[in-house]
């Protein structure tokens, strides 16, 4: 009997030692987290943190440099970039709800309220220093906060400017206008540069039917999309917005200086394909647009947005870095975010022409000296109007873009378009989180 007890105890000890040797633990199961942050902490090996983005790091050199520089400065952390190539915002909500939790993730500013109000993001107020906050450009701060709480850190800023195809201008014998040009001059030039038909057709201006492209022109007229409380849209009541809508309608239907989406896409799916094919003379873009044109060998220059009533206004979009609320090691995640959104990371993005800095701590001297027009990007940081965000912005934008198709095609009048948008917005924008 004693021998049986001894053998049982010996067997139990062997099983326990085997479990420990294999790294087993009764508490080791039950997490669906996508993070690897716990690895390496006990062994002295670097901890691996996962960073989810819609960019493929193998195709973006500035991301590769950010990763290399961060890991060199933080040898205890390794970064693994994970690409979500399509339908990013909705896909990430599904992943977070299912327990797949990255350590850091990229997020567009218009999605920050949606995520924050659904309790998916970690507040950053206790992690970001006052120095960090004080150095942000004014256009950036609104993009990072929801109801007074900071939920995001800026990846970069994209103030909009007007790109001009200098080859098309030269071929037509038209001089590049001065940087204080007006919307009236812009319209006249667009008409002059719209010629031909069929295979020989070319157009003065084009913008893809995306919300940020359309809003750039609304912002130029100092217009608005949402009411102050965000519960309705103001297209039929805000006079500046109505003026902008009428102007865009006229570009398509009165002056006929814009190709349809179908006409533009015959040159490629990229929204700037017609510009790069020397078929569109002017188009709104951001700093990263220059990299696209440079890679294609496109001849171009840049001007500020044409002025309306003596003032040049541009819109600006902010892409951000956020930390999911359930991230395993928030302090480590913040070290990544602080680098990517801080002086070091944003200097890399600026130097490699992928985005304007969100922080005044970044030195723009060399960037401005590169070209005569780079100063326009930097000047826009002080005056740009933030892209409007809303809890129900995604659904609103889908509806808005669908209605825009009918407006540009001349199926709807501006008044009918404004009324239809406002009526549908009354239902969409009053939905709770």
Task: State each model region's role.
Residues 190-191, 232-262:
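Glycine-centered hinge/linker elements that transmit conformational signals in sensory
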């Amino acid at each position: 009997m004693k021998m049986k007890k001894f053998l049982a105890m010996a067997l139990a000890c062997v099983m326990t030692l085997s479990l420990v040797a294999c790294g087993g633990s009764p508490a080791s199961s039950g997490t669906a987290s996508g993070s690897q942050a716990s690895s390496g902490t006990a062994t002295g090996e670097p901890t691996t943190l996962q960073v989810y983005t819609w960019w493929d790091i193998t195709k973006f050199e500035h991301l590769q440099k950010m990763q290399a520089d961060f890991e060199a400065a933080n040898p205890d952390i390794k970064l693994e970039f994970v690409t979500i190539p399509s339908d990013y915002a909705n896909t990430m909500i599904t992943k977070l709800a299912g327990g797949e939790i990255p350590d850091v993730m990229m997020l567009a500013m218009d999605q920050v309220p949606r995520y924050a109000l659904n309790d998916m993001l970690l507040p950053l107020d206790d992690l970001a220093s006052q120095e960090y906050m004080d150095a942000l450009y004014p256009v950036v701060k609104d993009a990072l906060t929801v109801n007074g709480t900071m939920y995001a850190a800026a990846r970069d800023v994209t103030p909009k400017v007007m790109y001009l195809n200098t080859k098309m201008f030269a071929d037509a014998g038209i001089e590049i206008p001065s940087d204080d040009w007006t919307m009236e001059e812009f319209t006249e030039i667009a008409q002059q540069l719209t010629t031909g038909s069929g295979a020989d057709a070319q157009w003065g201006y084009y913008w893809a039917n995306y919300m940020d492209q359309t809003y750039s022109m609304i912002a130029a007229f100092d217009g608005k999309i949402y009411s102050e409380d965000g519960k309705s849209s103001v297209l039929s009541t805000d006079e500046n917005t109505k003026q902008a809508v009428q102007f865009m309608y006229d570009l398509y239907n009165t002056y006929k200086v814009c190709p349809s989406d179908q006409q533009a896409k015959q040159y490629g799916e990229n929204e700037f394909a017609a510009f790069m094919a020397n078929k569109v003379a002017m188009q709104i873009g951001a700093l990263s647009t220059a990299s696209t044109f440079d890679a294609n060998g496109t001849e171009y220059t840049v001007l500020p947005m044409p002025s309306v009533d003596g003032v040049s206004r541009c819109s600006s979009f902010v892409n951000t870095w956020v930390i999911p609320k359930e991230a395993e090691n928030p302090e480590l995640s913040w070290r990544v975010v602080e680098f990517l959104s801080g002086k070091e990371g944003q200097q890399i993005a600026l130097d490699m022409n992928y985005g304007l800095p969100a922080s005044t701590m970044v030195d723009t001297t060399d960037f401005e000296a590169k070209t005569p027009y780079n100063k326009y990007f930097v000047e826009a940081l002080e005056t740009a109007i933030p892209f409007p965000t809303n809890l129900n912005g995604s659904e609103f934008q889908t509806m808005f873009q669908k209605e825009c198709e009918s407006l540009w095609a001349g199926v709807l009048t501006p008044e009918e378009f404004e009324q239809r948008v406002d009526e549908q917005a009354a239902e969409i924008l009053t939905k709770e989180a």
